[in-house]
Amino acid sequence: PKPTLARVNGSAYGGGVGLVACCDIAIGVEGAKFSLSEAKLGLVPAVISPYVVAAIDARQARKLFQTAEVFEAPEAARIGLLHRCVPAAELDEAVDRELHWLGKGGPLAQAEAKSLALRMGGMTRADAERIDTENARLIARLRVSPEGQEGLAAFLDKRAPRWVNP
């Protein structure tokens, strides 16, 4: 595996948060906004959930998965989604600094270090594949549910969803 770096110069919602969470290093500008917005659509962030939970911890994830609230870059840094939050004028310099340090490491050592950290996180490749399969089933089931259909229709119609209690 190669090192990955997220350079966040804007907002990230839904799967965009997942992409940030997947990266080894994440740097964002102070004005960036984030939201795990799937619940507003009657869905869940199933596909990205393993990566988001690994980045921000389960308790933060429970809150943000359910509320779908918008949070800003300083909060993203505080909870671990971003490693650094910088003024927009300093983003390129901050990214260059990280790339400088990455460029000093041996590629094999970096790949093994990344693999080691992933293993220490407790998830094997088989675990990840099983979770991906379970999450794919979950999101497929929710997308065709009445709630998922209403959420997506409301999003496309640019209106508030009309939720019905189960």
Predicted features, each with a name:
Residues P1-Q110, S145, R159:
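Crotonase-fold acyl-CoA enzyme core
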Residues L64-F65, L116-G122, R137-R143:
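Helix-loop "lid/cap" segments that line or gate small-molecule binding pockets
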Residues T124-I131:
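Short beta-strand->loop
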Residues A160-P166:
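Short C-terminal tail/terminal secondary-structure segment
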